[in-house]
């Protein structure tokens, strides 16, 4: 092609792109795929909607009754539908809170090590250990704490023992959340800080951590939501109490899963109402924590 021909071609209008219509076979495949994925979504949604409907229908009467959120079951007879779940709600939040106080610093320091410092064999061993710990069943964690904390060291069953088991369940979630958020921080920010002579530890504290903090907090809340409903640790490591126990190191302490398990043995109708009311209360607690995590992510995204 000569140069003059090329120049003349530039003066010609651009031909519109012509798309061939979909063949009948491709339209059928597309319709089948769309129907399949939509049906899969509906099938997956049905059990969730059914579960929520049953729990709300059977537990709504209890959670809307006066005193449900502000009273315990102290002095309440099994056949009486009185009192509330204040003691169990308090125990659930205290056990999860103590576990978070122990697991969050350890998990975040582990995440910082893996992202900022870990490059050798120790880093690979730590990553493998976290992966294994993420798959440990809650009953195994409870039995480990029982054998070490109670059978070997001689401490008694308590809410603190439950918190130790919950730490083992929370730790891998906190580590993974912190690790993912720290890796999302651009390396250019670290390099700019190093170029100004800022030490690595101060770069992590002043630059990397504040940027990753919204995602880390969201991950922490999700880890708490993951453990508040665990039943095995409370069955193995602490006894049930009808009243509030403020001492986490001594005595029995109720929780929502333990209340549900205890009231299942109550043949009276009041026990039936308390079981479903406690189940709905637990769902409300978990949903509230997840909603808080979603709001933190949303606010952090808007600010960016």
Curated annotation (Swiss-Prot):
Alphabetically sorted, this entry's keywords are:
Cell membrane, Membrane, Phosphate transport, Transmembrane, Transmembrane helix, Transport
- Entry membrane topology: Multi-pass membrane protein
User: InterPro entries given for it?
Assistant: MetI-like, MetI-like_sf, Phosphate_PstA, Phosphate_transprt_permease
Q: Which residues cross the membrane?
A: 36-56, 96-116, 132-152, 155-175, 204-224, 276-296
The main location is membrane
Q: Which SUPFAM superfamilies match?
A: MetI-like
Role of this protein: Part of the binding-protein-dependent transport system for phosphate; probably responsible for the translocation of the substrate across the membrane.
Family as reported in the entry's similarity comment? Belongs to the binding-protein-dependent transport system permease family. CysTW subfamily.
What name has this protein been given in UniProt? Phosphate transport system permease protein PstA 1
Q: Per the UniProt entry, what species is this protein from, by scientific name? A: Mycobacterium tuberculosis (strain CDC 1551 / Oshkosh)
